[in-house]
């Protein structure tokens, strides 16, 4: 079952936390859910070259806080903060004007330890007509240098322009998908090539998080380990 379900959703409340943190009644919930989707889609389209790993949205009664984790904060901030100000103005048109908007940018120290950025690297290489085996091999080497304990990459489609689509995958180290305490990062992306669309999936194993360890507290953003077990 661990190989079929989404690795991040499978670990919500254990080693992963929600990317959107807010509460709403049954009437407002679908509106806010669509609003979150619009926010993420707009940021990814506007900052497609900013190497964004994740976007977290926290809502309060009169405030919306957006956290952007990126490997290239200079592109997001812009010259003298002009980029982030332009982004804030554009996002305010999507949100309720009565709510205050805050946008925080966090720099990712090691981009090769993020599955999203590894998958984007592979898709960029494939769209530049680099052989898929070479692109995957480079991505695996970069992930290993980032001190990940295991990496698995799968590429599907008309590989190297073959007539019949197929899937090939490479794994180095351990990637225990069925171990709930395993800190697994996952991402899937699409590469649009002249031969069609190629699917790219990346799994990164960053180590096991034990219930009594402090790393679980930081991973799930809770105050005590007991609260994670309840």
From Swiss-Prot:
Example GO molecular function term?
Answer: rRNA binding
Q: Which GO terms describe its biological process?
A: translation
Which SMART domains does the UniProt entry name for this protein?
Answer: KH (SM00322)
Q: A Gene Ontology CC term for this entry? A: chloroplast
SUPFAM superfamilies, sorted: Prokaryotic type KH domain (KH-domain type II) (SSF54814), Ribosomal protein S3 C-terminal domain (SSF54821)
Subcellular location per the Swiss-Prot or TrEMBL entry: Plastid, Chloroplast
Key words, A-Z:
Chloroplast, Plastid, Ribonucleoprotein, Ribosomal protein, RNA-binding, rRNA-binding
Which domain of life does the protein's organism represent?
A: Eukaryota
Q: Which InterPro entries match?
A: KH_dom, KH_dom-like_a/b, KH_dom_type_2, KH_sf_prok-type, Ribosomal_S3_C_sf, Ribosomal_uS3_bac-typ, Ribosomal_uS3_C, Ribosomal_uS3_CS
Q: Where is the KH type-2 domain?
A: 39-109
Q: Which Pfam family is an annotated match for this chain, by its short name?
A: Ribosomal_S3_C
The record's annotation in HAMAP family points to: Ribosomal_uS3_B (MF_01309_B)
- Which protein family is it in? Belongs to the universal ribosomal protein uS3 family.
Quaternary structure per UniProt? Part of the 30S ribosomal subunit.
The protein here is known as: Small ribosomal subunit protein uS3c
Q: Which organism is it from?
A: Pyropia yezoensis (Susabi-nori)
Lineage of producing organism:
Eukaryota, Rhodophyta, Bangiophyceae, Bangiales, Bangiaceae
């Amino acid at each position: 079952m661990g190989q079929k379900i989404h690795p991040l959703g499978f670990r919500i409340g254990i080693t992963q936390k929600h990317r959107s943190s807010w509460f709403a009644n049954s009437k407002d919930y679908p509106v806010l859910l669509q609003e979150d989707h619009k926010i993420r889609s707009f940021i990814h389209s506007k900052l497609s070259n900013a190497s964004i790993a994740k976007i977290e949205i926290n809502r309060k009664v009169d405030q919306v806080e957006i956290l952007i984790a990126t490997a290239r904060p200079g592109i997001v901030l812009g010259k003298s903060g002009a980029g982030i100000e332009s982004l804030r103005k554009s996002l305010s048109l999507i949100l309720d004007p009565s709510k205050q908007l805050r946008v925080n940018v966090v720099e990712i120290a090691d981009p090769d330890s993020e599955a999203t950025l590894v998958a984007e690297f592979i898709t960029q290489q494939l769209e530049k007509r680099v052989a898929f085996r070479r692109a995957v091999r480079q991505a695996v080497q970069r992930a290993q240098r980032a001190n990940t304990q295991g990496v698995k990459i799968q590429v599907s489609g008309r590989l190297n322009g073959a007539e019949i689509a197929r899937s090939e995958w490479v794994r180095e180290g351990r990637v225990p998908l069925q171990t709930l305490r395993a800190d697994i990062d996952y991402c899937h992306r699409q590469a649009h090539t002249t031969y069609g669309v190629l699917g790219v999936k990346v799994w990164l194993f960053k180590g096991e998080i034990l219930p009594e360890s402090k790393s679980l507290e930081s991973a799930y953003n809770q105050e005590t380990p007991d609260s994670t077990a309840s």
